[in-house]
Amino acid sequence: MAGHSKWANTKHRKAAQDAKKGKIFTKIIRELVTSARLGGGDPASNPRLRTAIDKALSHNMTRDTLNRAIARGIGGGEDSHMENILYEGYGPAGTAVMVSCLSDNRNRTVSEVRHAFTKTGGNLGTGGSVSYLFTKKGVFSYAPGLNEDQVMELALESGADDIMVYDDGAIDIFSSPEFFETIKKTLETAGLMASTAEISMIPSTKIDLNLENAQRLLRLIDMLEDSDDVQEVYHNGDFSDEISAALFFKNTKP
């Protein structure tokens, strides 16, 4: 599977994401509430809730906040009419973009999503317009410094489809969704903790972007993620190492 490591490609976004910690917590709490409402409050029997809990803990959410969100989901109330909505569209240079939302007001959400596409020169498409370009996969990202042979051996034995080892030592593991929990448990039992572990949408092909289009795509992503309703944004844009470095420099200048 070609492309740059998600670990490497998102380094330049860390400062901006840290500034949005409050919004990230809002999104995670919404997912905790909804997953508990739909599948119950026991993570052992609710994979969606288990994934949401892992994400919450990876962002240093307190157990108290986490447990209150789950309790809200079990109890119903104001969050009981949340629905999952998936929007598809085109970003700069024809990049395919998928936007996963969790909303209690479809009209508000589509208005915010459409506005983000329009402001950055893209356009919101119809259902099915770009989803055929993506495949649902389990994705595990590991920071540099782990025993590569051990990670690869355990992952392949547990059902991994593909493994990428990058020049800096970062590792990405890809699997079909049904093997996600098995791989996660196997590697964690061996003491190998992923930086991120999630079910994601992986593009079958990528579009190389120049600096201008990369900046426009990141602006689109930032605008989408500013909406509390948007949970995840997937795209098939790709940046070279040089452009990633230029973006990092631009975002860190005083």
Curated annotation (Swiss-Prot):
Q: Where is this region: Disordered?
A: 1-20
State the compartments where it is located. Answer: Cytoplasm
Entry's Gene Ontology cellular component terms: cytosol
Q: Which UniProt keywords apply?
A: Cytoplasm, DNA-binding, Transcription, Transcription regulation
Main subcellular location of this protein, as a coarse class: cytoplasm
Q: One GO molecular-function annotation for this sequence?
A: DNA binding
The keyword DNA-binding appears for this protein: yes
A biological process (GO) of this protein is: regulation of DNA-templated transcription
Give the matching Gene3D superfamilies: 1.10.10.200, 3.30.70.980
Transmembrane helix is among the record's keywords: no
Q: Which family does it belong to?
A: Belongs to the TACO1 family.
The record's HAMAP family line, in alphabetical order, gives: Transcrip_reg_TACO1
State the name under which the record lists this protein: Probable transcriptional regulatory protein HDEF_0869
- Lineage, top ranks: Bacteria, Pseudomonadati, Pseudomonadota, Gammaproteobacteria, Enterobacterales
